[in-house]
Amino acid sequence: MPNWCSTAYVIEGDTQEVKALYELMKGLEEQEKPTVENGFGTAWLGCLVDALGGDWHDVRCRGHWDGLDFDGYVLTFWTETAWATCNEVFELVRQKFPSLCYYYRAEEPGMGDYYTNDIEGRYYPERYLIDLSTDKGDWHTEYFEDRTSLYEWLEEIAGVPVRSEQDVQSLEERWEEINPDAYININEFKVFED
């Protein structure tokens, strides 16, 4: 069984090309049966590869998309894929629709991989993700652009000063004394240029 990678995408470019891609993906979703037999359904990335004229055997496409939305300018959706992003699919999209570019933010918590290609933070400015369970068992997951705002938020949750990684570790230790299931995970998104 793989670790699953959740990836949020934004695709922008020439409006007609964005719309054409949206209509292609929406049409695939609405099929009664997938165009290529698979275990993911009609929104399998391999169906998109096939519709673009590619061979799904040659392109990493182990997963599906969901949450498809077109606001008239940009296309947004997310994917759930095995182990990592399936950006090869979107490189194929770019071959068919040359004006398009894609931005993504990927999270694969099983291996602690968090990354984005949104260098300027145009769509995904957050560089940190905190996931925690307090001493009272309250769960929180939040995104932050910088450590300062993360620490300020954590300070509000905890009711004690938090200004450094050492403060976070001390807080986690105090919470664990009260509730052994308490934890604080801070994940930093690596920024890659595709």
Indicate residue ranges for each PLM-predicted region.
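Intrinsic low-complexity, intrinsically disordered or marginally ordered coil/linker segments
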Residues: M1-D194
